[in-house]
């Protein structure tokens, strides 16, 4: 059971990190404020690093990882595109990122609870990704 919980939790963590990168990519080019841009770029890098660490653990278990659901990616891209056309790109970007972080924290926390027998390494990396999402949401609040 421990190995299955570990594998499942890592897959969800992988999908979450990829979704975070994609969400940041979806708004980054429209951000005008340099501080906000830098903040998002740093978080994107951190999401990539966590995703890479997750993939290393998945590879060691013989797994190729998990892509975010196509429907979720498509809906997020559509929402980003529509919101970014509404004006004040920095405020819209902060709003989208805040929403995305909230969804990420909720789903990753749910998976952490759902797979309690996952190895400590898998739980740790999931908690780190949750922490990154919480930190990013807090950091973009001044731009809302």
Where are these regions (language model features)?
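Amphipathic alpha-helical hairpins
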Residues: 1-144
């Amino acid at each position: 059971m421990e190995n299955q919980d570990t594998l499942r939790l890592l897959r969800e963590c992988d999908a979450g990190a990829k979704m975070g990168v994609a969400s940041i990519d979806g708004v980054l080019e429209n951000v005008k404020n340099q501080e906000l841009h830098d903040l998002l770029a740093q978080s994107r890098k951190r999401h990539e690093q966590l995703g890479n660490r997750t993939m290393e653990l998945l590879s060691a278990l013989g797994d190729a990882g998990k892509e975010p659901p196509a429907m979720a990616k498509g809906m997020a891209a559509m929402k980003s595109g529509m919101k970014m056309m509404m004006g004040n790109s920095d405020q819209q970007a902060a709003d989208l990122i805040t929403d995305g972080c909230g969804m990420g924290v909720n789903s990753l926390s749910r998976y952490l609870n759902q797979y309690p027998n996952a190895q400590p390494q898998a739980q740790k990396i999931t908690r780190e990704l949750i922490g990154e999402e919480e930190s990013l949401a807090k950091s973009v609040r001044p731009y809302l």
